[in-house]
Amino acid sequence: MKNFILLAVSSILLVDLFPTHCGHNVDLSKAINLNGVNFNNVDASSLGAAHVGQSASRGRGLGENPDDEEGDAKKKKDGKKAEPKNPRENKLKQPGDRADGQPAGDRADGQPAGDRADGQPAGDRAAGQPAGDRADGQPAGDRADGQPAGDRADGQPAGDRADGQPAGDRAAGQPAGDRAAGQPAGDRADGQPAGDRAAGQPAGDRADGQPAGDRAAGQPAGDRADGQPAGDRAAGQPAGDRAAGQPAGDRAAGQPAGDRAAGQPAGNGAGGQAAGGNAGGGQGQNNEGANAPNEKSVKEYLDKVRATVGTEWTPCSVTCGVGVRVRRRVNAANKKPEDLTLNDLETDVCTMDKCAGIFNVVSNSLGLVILLVLALFN
């Protein structure tokens, strides 16, 4: 019996030493995640269908009384017709406070609207008039006879203006008031489309022959040197506050963006960097960020895999934890292995499983050795 127990424990420890991809030593967190996925993927439609079927199986709607159905069956057998306890009304009640046969209350008999005279569609107006408080035969009140709108002269469509004019307070024959004769807009000289400017100019307050004011002759925009499209910059420059021949200010000569080193397309980056400020030389912004591989570790790993490195990623440099992997750049695909440098490689940070697995292997091995020793010497 003792030997059987030792054999069973030894077998368990041996099985625990198998690789994880063989189905043993499964990570508990992964198992929990799988269980959660299986639970979350349950089709809830089946539950709803079961609930609907249960409701339909009852065979009656809400508010029905099964006792009434039984009573009706008994009365049908007796040949008598049962009367409902609360007979339903087939017609809606009419609105109150009106006379019989009237659609609206507080009005006289035969009238569609109350508080008006007999035979009139609207109250508080004179007989034969569609609208009250106006003269006889007029469609709108408080105006002269034969006029569609009040408070204006005879024969005029709008009041307070001269005869024959469509708009008031202007001279005769003019479409707009307070301007000179024959002009479409006031307060300007004769023959000019806009006022307060010199003759023959499209915009005021500028010199003759200039499209915009307050600038030097022949210049499209003010406050700049002659022949320049934008002000406050050196002659021949398209933008101000920068060195001559530069497209943008506050940067070194030949740079497309300011506050960065020469030859850099993005700010705060080291020389030769196209993306990711504050990155190391030749390195873009990688997947691990703060865990970027240093040059020393890459060199050491390159010396180990120099003969086998190609255009595909190499295995990770570590078996657990954080390491690096490398591959050749496209332009260095045909280069000899002994001539490879760091500039010929692309590097990436790789993260393997936690190193706790190694500790488990060591501890299980020690336990197995102890059990074997006890089994042999007892």
UniProtKB/Swiss-Prot annotation:
Keywords: Cell membrane, Cytoplasm, Disulfide bond, Glycoprotein, GPI-anchor, Lipoprotein, Malaria, Membrane, Repeat, Signal, Sporozoite
Comp. bias (Basic and acidic residues): 72-100
Skewed-composition ranges (Low complexity): 285-295
Signal peptide: 1-22
Lipid attachment residues per UniProt (GPI-anchor amidated cysteine): 355
Domain of life: Eukaryota
Glycosylation sites: 319
Ranges of Gly residues composition bias in the record: 266-284
PTM comment text: During host cell invasion, proteolytically cleaved at the cell membrane in the region I by a papain-like cysteine protease of parasite origin. Cleavage is triggered by the sporozoite contact with highly sulfated heparan sulfate proteoglycans (HSPGs) present on the host hepatocyte cell surface. Cleavage exposes the TSP type-1 (TSR) domain and is required for productive invasion of host hepatocytes but not for adhesion to the host cell membrane. Cleavage is dispensable for sporozoite development in the oocyst, motility and for traversal of host and vector cells.
InterPro entries reported for this sequence: Crcmsprzoite (IPR003067), TSP1_rpt (IPR000884), TSP1_rpt_sf (IPR036383)
UniProt repeat feature Sequence, residue ranges: 95-103, 104-112, 113-121, 122-130, 131-139, 140-148, 149-157, 158-166, 167-175, 176-184, 185-193, 194-202, 203-211, 212-220, 221-229, 230-238, 239-247, 248-256, 257-265
Chief location: membrane
TSP type-1 domain: residues covered: 304-356
Pfam families, per database record: TSP_1
Region (Disordered): 51-295
Positions of the UniProt region annotated as Required for the binding to heparan sulfate proteoglycans (HSPGs) on the surface of host hepatocytes: 80-88
Disulfide bond entries: 316-350, 320-355
Propeptide: 356-378
Function: Essential sporozoite protein. In the mosquito vector, required for sporozoite development in the oocyst, migration through the vector hemolymph and entry into the vector salivary glands. In the vertebrate host, required for sporozoite migration through the host dermis and infection of host hepatocytes. Binds to highly sulfated heparan sulfate proteoglycans (HSPGs) on the surface of host hepatocytes.
Protein name: Circumsporozoite protein
Gene responsible for this protein: CSP
